[in-house]
Amino acid sequence: MASCDSPDAFSWLQTLPPLSQWNRNSMSMCICSPNSIHPSLNFSLTRSPHSPNTFTFSIIANFKIPISLFVSKPLRIISSNSTKFLNENVISTLLMGFVDVVLNYNAKRTTYIFQIQNLTSTSNLKDVFNLAFFTFVFLICIYEAPTSLRTTCLKTVKDQLVTCRSRQGSKLLMVQLGSNLEEQWMRSLNLAITNWIIEIKAFQHLKSPSPLFSYAFSTQGLWKVHMYCPVIAMEMESVNSALTDERLFFSLNYHQLEGVIQFNHKIYVREKWFNIAVNIDNVRCDIIRLVNETLLSERGMGEEEKHFPSRISLQLTPTVQSNILMVSVQKSSENPLREFEVEKGIEATIEPPNTFFGLKVSANETTTKSMKPWKFEESVHGYSANLTWFLHDADDGREVSSSKPSKVSMMNPRAWFKNRYSNAFRPFTKQGGVVFAGDSYGQSVLWKVDKRANGKLMEFEIKGCVWLTYWPNKHHTFYSDTRKLEFKEMLYLNLP
């Protein structure tokens, strides 16, 4: 049996002989062992006694009488002349088995087609395999493991999932899955994390995990960043009161933030410098439910009581700045036109003789102005370009992310945030997200780079913050909060 100190499923499988040469029907690897008096958690492979090329994999809680927490369906592999158990066919079979288990924990159990493409040419295959394996084990621990094992084993598995190698493996696995299955994978994982955090907070015996998952890739002319995070795991920026309504708590916390940021970039060659122009292609943020609509209605307040994006801030910075000559933005600061409407009136009345004045005069003045709910700003700090979108209160013009609604507005059925997903003037999509595209926000940020940098790989750091705010939609409550998520990724481009 492999050691529990540093579980490595891929390396352990490489040590196994072919299935036909096993001297016993079952082989096991220790995943974690809390201590000598508690049972260990094992990953086990079991050969079918009736079919020499068929096996199952399982997760076993190794009590005095072992308990199977999960057993896969029988998996058949192709016979080969390999001297080891682990070959391309076995890797593909196991990897697809792990992925299938994770996807089946998704609230939306839709049919899917998944095949591993070009497995032998996949770089960091070991990292991809171990990432899928530990994600599978992570979900089994959350949903199936007894309390005596769960806490310690979850910490062991989480520590494996947050290593640099696992982060690289996760990016490569997402490429293999494709966009649709990637979303299902992250919803399965973040549903499990949400359940775990709620359990942690209920018993207060362990610090909440850091479940943000983000990745970026750079290709010719395009940068792209994906991010996913359960709402319950986001940092609380402000809150006006304790949330005691259990149904509202359920609705607000069983959602996740899904974000996509896309930039187009182009290099213009000049006599003495390069112009690197970066412009917004798409910035998308959605708040997606993690459980089905029926459960949200029965245990919560329905799907429409959820957070909405209230501020998005992005910063792009070249990491090596010795060859940067200047940076400029193309959007001016706001100089809004304000419209005034002045109404004046005089009202005269005759008062009784014993009053000091016999005439009353009153005047009134009305001011109106028009504004869009979302305001976009560009700014520069050093060689960093900052892009920020602010949502403003349609009633008083304040920034939503840094303010709280009054109790009067919370009870007003005509307030802008009431019925916000069906209102014709909503500042969101029908589903409650936002899309900022190049048609309205296509201005470029321009860096001038010295010609001596030709042929070099330029590295840019993108740092971002997303704020989500909850103000009541249809539910009658005075509760409100704003949460924040921070992320950081690296982007690359080659200078000619």
Language-model segments: residues:
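Proline-rich intrinsically disordered, low-complexity coils
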Residues: 7, 17-20, 28, 33-34, ...
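Deployable pore-forming modules of oligomeric membrane-permeabilizing proteins
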Residues: 83-84, 88-345, 373-429
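Intrinsically disordered, low-complexity regions enriched in Ser/Pro/Gly/Gln/His and often acidic
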Residues: 5, 15, 178, 189, ...
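Long amphipathic alpha-helical coiled-coil/heptad-repeat bundle
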Residues: 2-110
